[in-house]
Each structure stands twice: as C-alpha cells, then as structure tokens.
Amino acid sequence: MGFCMKDSKQYYKSSIGKSLKRSNGYLKLVLVLYLIMVSWSGYSKEVFNSRTKENINANWLYLEKNIKDINLALNDANWESINLPHTWNALDATDLNPGYRRSGSWYKKELAISNIENNKLYQLYFEGVNINSEVYVNGQKAGGHIGGYIGFTIDITEFIKSGKNDIVIRVDNSYDPEVIPSQKSDFFIFGGITRDVWLETIPKQHLSELKITTPKVSENEAELLATVAINNLNNSNLKVQANLLDAQGVTVVSSVFKIKNNTAKIHFRNIKNPKLWDTEHPNLYTLKVALLEKGDVIDSVQNRVGFRWFEFKDHGAFYLNGKRVLLRGTHRHEEHAGVGAAMSNMQHRKDMELIKDMGANFVRLAHYPQDPEVYKACDELGLLIWDELPWCRGGLGNETWKTNTKNMLTEIINQNYNHPSIIIWSLGNEMYWLPDFENGDDTDKMNSFLTELNDLAHQLDPSRKTAIRKYYEGSHIVDVFSPSIWSGWYSGSYKSYQKAIDTYKKEYPHFLHAEYGGSSHVGRHTENPVTGEGKIQSDGWEEEIVQTDVANIAQIGDWSENYIVDLFDWHLRISENDENFVGNVQWAFKDFGTPLRPENAIPYMNQKGLVDRAGNPKDAFYVFKSYWSKEPFTYIESHTWTERQGPKDLARDISVYSNCPEVELFLNGKSLGVKKRDLKVFPAAGLNWNLNFKEGKNTLVAVGKTKENKTVKDELAINYRFTKNGKAVGLKLESELLENGNYLVTAIAYDKNGLRCLDYEDQVYFQCLSGGETLKSQGTPTGSESIAMANGKAAIEVKRDGKNIPVVMMVLNQNFKGTYLTIE
C-alpha cells in the first residue's frame, strides 16, 4: 500500500499544438509559454487525470445487528441512513446507561461508477475502521483488515462493474484478545467506520510506497534520499522524474532517475540553504515524483518534506536543528463530545490548533495512531509527535497476537513515515499490566518480543527513536524511556517532582517524562484544597496497578480546579527552570471517555483534561498558556469560581496567570499594585495577591503589560458573602435560554436560609419528563444526566421536542427525592 497516494494531486495535460502558425513572433510566444509550463510543472508532458480521489462519506446505510452472514444482513429491514465518519458508541459510552456496545455492525453504500477504464485500478481507501473489518463488493469478499486506527486499501478492480455497485462492510469491535489494544485499557474502543473513506483510481502502471528521508541536514546544506516502488506490468522502459518545490511552489532542484528492480532511488545531495522545519517555523517543501514513459507522465504522486535533525543528549536535554528545545507536551485521545471517535477533519484540526495556541510543541498520540488530519496539522503547525503502537496493557499474547502486533507496527511506520513532525515510534504503554494470556507478564518473553519490535522499527525507519512508557524491565531495549511519575495524584505530593526527575535523569540516558496531572471537575473550587500533607507519604510518585491499599490525592482529594492549577504550576515551574531536562508531557489535553471510571464526577469520563470533552478550556489550560504561549494574555483564577464565602476581613489569595512581564490588579477600581513575573516563584510566577473582598459584588481587573508597553486585561466579577452556608436541605431548578434556542437547566443545592451550599458535592440526576430532551451522554459539564455537583451547582442543556408543550424537568438524588421545573 502506497501511503503517499493519499496526498497525491491530479496533474493536467500540457502540450503544444502541432498546427502552429510559423510567424516568428508567435513562435517566441509559444516558446515563452512552454518554458513557463515546464518551469512550473517540471515535466515535458503530463497525462490528464492520471489519478482520482473521491470522498465517499455521504449516503451510507447502517445496520446495528451482529449478523455474521452478509445475505441475512442485506435482507434485514432495519437499515438506517447515516454519513461517515460514524461510530455506534457515540452516545452509549457515557452517562447513566452506558451500554458500551462491543459487537458487530454492517455498513453499505451504492457506489456509481459510470465508465470503467481498463488501464486503471480501482480501490477503496479507509483511513480507519475499528476494529476488525470485512469488505464486500457486489456480494463478493474483496478484502478486510485486522486492527483499528490504521488506514488500509482494498483493491476492488476485479469486483466492480459499470453502473451501480454495492459496497458492504462488516465492522466488529468485539473483545478480541488477539488484537491490541487490550480491553483493560483506560479508554473506549469506539466501533465503526470512524474516519474518511475514499474511492481512488490509479493507473495500472503506477508509483507507490514513496519513502522520504533527509540523511544529512544543516543550516547550509541538506540531502534528500527517497525511494519509490513502481508497478510496471508491461515491463516498459520507464523513468522517474522528481522535483523538489519550496513553499511558494518554486522548483529548488529537479532530476530524472532510472528504475532498477521496480524501484527508483531519488537522491538530491546538495540542497543549498534549506529552510529548516522546527516548532516555531515549520517550513515545508513538496517532493513531486512523476513516472515517465517515452517522455509522457503516466502517473505522479507528491509528498511534503521537512528538513530537520534532532538529538537526545545522554542524560541531558533534547536538541532540534542544533538548538536546545524543551519539549512542552500534552497527550491527545481521538474523541469529542457527541460524536466519540467519529470526528470531522475540522474537529481534529481545531484540537491541534488549540494545543498549539496553548504553546505546546509536542504531542503524544495516545495510545494509538490517529486520523491523517492530525499528522497533517502537526506538520503545518510545528508540533513534534510521539506516535504510539496500541500495545496498551494486556501483557504478551499468543503467536497470532504477535503477528497482528508486528503487522500493525509495520503499517503505522509505513503510513506515517514521511511526516517531519514525528520523532518517536512508541512500542507501547504499561504493556505488562494485567495480562490477557497465561504467563503474559513473563519478563524474559516480554523483553524478547519487545526486542523484535524495536529491531523492526529501526529496520523500517533507522532515522527515528523508539520508546515505551512504564515498563521498567524493558527500558534498556528502546531509545527513549518514560517511567511513571504521578507526583501529587497517584502517589506523594507534587512537591516531590524535582526529586523524581533528578532520580530518573541519572538512571535513564534518554528520559522523557510522559504522563502527569490529575482530575478536575469544572466549577469545583475550595479555599483550602486537599494537598495530602500529613495524610500521605510526600516523596512517592509511582502509580500502583491496584490502588485499594494506597493513600493518594486521586482518592482523598477534592478534584477542585484550583488544586490541579497548583499541581501543574509546580510541575511547570520545575521543568521550565531545568536546563538539562528533555521535557514532560501532560496527561491529557481533553477529557475522554473510559469504561473503567463509572464512579467519576461525570460518569465514565477521565477528567484529567485541560479542556472538557467539547474543547472548552478549564483553569489549568491557562496555567500552561502562561508558561508556554507567546501571545500576550492575562487570566484571573477563576472564571468558574464566581460565588465565594468567608469571614469578614479574612484575606483571600488571587492568582493571575499571564505571560506578560508585569501585571497590575484592581479590586473594585482600586489598584492593588504591580507585580513582576518571575518563573522561579510559586504560585503563578509571583502574580499573586492577598486581598479582602467586600460583601456582595466585587470586580477584579488584571492588566498585563508587555515589553512593548501594550496592555491586555481580564475582568472577573465575584459575589462574596460573609455568611457560611449550612447543610443542604433541598435542590432548586432554574432555566436560562441559550443563543442556540436550547435551555440551560441549573440545579442548586441550598440550606435552610436559602444560601447556595458551596460545599455540596453529591451526585444528582436530571431527567426531562416532557416537552423536550436532554443533551445527555456528551461527557461534558452540561451534557450528562448524572453529574456530581460543583460548589453546590450542576446543569444540563435541554432541547425542545417541537410539540409545543411545556418542558418539564426533574432533578433528584438519594437525599432529595425530586424537584421539578416547568418551562412554558
């Protein structure tokens, strides 16, 4: 399978007519036009429409039945219309009734092909199907694929006919111990055709498997070496022409290369003064390759190229293009509220842009390869990638498991080989945990297979590093290793972080810290976050597999936003001030679904994200932005903490997160002074004030000033009371009309005096009894029928059903048996 073909463009015929007027002026004009065309295309003559690529996401039918036989499936009457991408787990994986479906389903589409060309191959390209699939064309099995998260091609040439063609696909995400990832992984394995599908036509004599390397790169000169396979059915006398174009489309270098053993080696040795690809300036070139027969272009492909080199110094820092770069990273799971893993390209792109806007330069794609749009965005935005084989937990499997796993690694590397953003091929995460097979945690056997994978990765791609996370016994096998450091969450205090990284910098030659952080429930705050001091051992940082006998913040903490803000602030202060540290990778950028966490504040959600599942930033997002982003901003902690209480004249801490050199804070129009930002000071790099609120409404304004004397400001209104609430005696409901026409229904816990109970955290349950429906199963702070209160408050979005009757809402829990609200 030629992964380069997914980015190939169509080339158009450019020829000069033979019946030209022989006037001298006309010949000059023709010559000029010809030279312009040649300089633009690099080719003497191009064949019109040599390749086509058509997106066929629209107008599919879906059958949610686990039927094995295709004929029984086709005769079923329950097919429903859908568009791709699609997952049947979009709305069943979270909330009150998860019903996480792991089973088989069917998809079908009528595909019209008007005229079949005998000199063309026809193929379907699937960007990703979870997790096993069988593809049928006009009733015949054309192929299939084992394993999700990877693109694959099905040649349908011999199965199609002119006119209408029936494409039928069986997809199955059932538990299969022989296919990674393990069911014990802490994320949902979404079933379905979760990415784009394409109909492609290519010439029977064609190019494939374009692999590009840059063996030598410096600021002054670069070398490009590429190989491309040729399918030469007719044993014709073919050649390959290659053009390297810069970002403006100008040809930098061009040459014609011979073909030997159906392979062409493209070698450009002296590319002068290349514009380097890095995280600040992700300069990209384009390599265009044409297959020539007697001077005519019969096929052509193209791929982007980035010139860069990198190095992990032994027991030291990371260098990109000879300059030290601190890896400022996060993790990304491929899912979004309401659609699960069936995200649009726009949603993928928005995720990556938000990560970049935060100031990150590195992303670990966990725990599986992701949509092609993600890699494309990282190439363009300047985000370095850790790409991961989904060997996540489950230990070592049988021989079939091993074959499937090696095949998947091969596919990942071949498919994503040409992306300059990728620097690491990860071979797994927590692989030894909870084996699915007998003796699956045998260290010697694990290491033997890990060595096979490591050798395979280096054989397929000698230019990049291999890595694993949290399998200590195999740390010596791979190039880069991440131990488990969860200071302040699964073990110890966050103040142990410096000791942890100092320990591992000495122990592992190439140490990159992947995964740290903790959960936060949007809107939950406390004046005195639980830090564990005096209750837990402060020096720990390792995450235990079984935590029933472990005291840690994950279990005894309050899940407040302000605790997590402090945790990240401490970690970033350490990493930003350590000159010999490679960097760290926060877990995870966005809240994501998991079958292992039904008891969480939002059921079945891992809430360690810097943004919620819909992409809305939490407080912690702005902590990272203050350390990493260059775009000036200020953010007062916290915009989700607007109701506070405490005794009169008791000073409260206010932190401002900003990347400006200095910030001035105003309370109710009065300046509280200017403070200088100092990255060595905790918290908030010294942008912290003690102040006294008045009773009632208070207005805070933070004004940041840049080095150029430009100002940016943030404003926050806080309602403060001197009376502490008592115990909750009931729940009340309120509604607000939103701009989209829906209602936000909010439940508030109150005491006997009617005060909102800011310390009430119990779970509540929403239900729409008539007149509408809740936007449930979103896994967001306003999209879950079951949710824990945050400072005595919880909400859900409700949509009218169009029947012109009042909306009747109910909220209840074990203590408060039912409160009702009617919205006319």
Curated annotation (Swiss-Prot):
GO molecular function, one term: beta-glucuronidase activity
Coiled-coil ranges per UniProt: none
Any Gene Ontology CC annotation: membrane
Membrane topology type: Single-pass membrane protein
Gene3D superfamilies assigned: Galactose-binding domain-like (2.60.120.260), Glycosidases (3.20.20.80), Immunoglobulins (2.60.40.10)
Pfam families: DUF4982, Glyco_hydro_2, Glyco_hydro_2_C, Glyco_hydro_2_N
Function of the molecule: Glycoside hydrolase that may be involved in ulvan degradation. Ulvan is the main polysaccharide component of the Ulvales (green seaweed) cell wall. It is composed of disaccharide building blocks comprising 3-sulfated rhamnose (Rha3S) linked to D-glucuronic acid (GlcA), L-iduronic acid (IduA), or D-xylose (Xyl).
Cross-referenced PANTHER family: BETA-GALACTOSIDASE (PTHR42732), BETA-MANNOSIDASE (PTHR42732:SF1)
Identification of the protein by name: Putative beta-glucuronidase
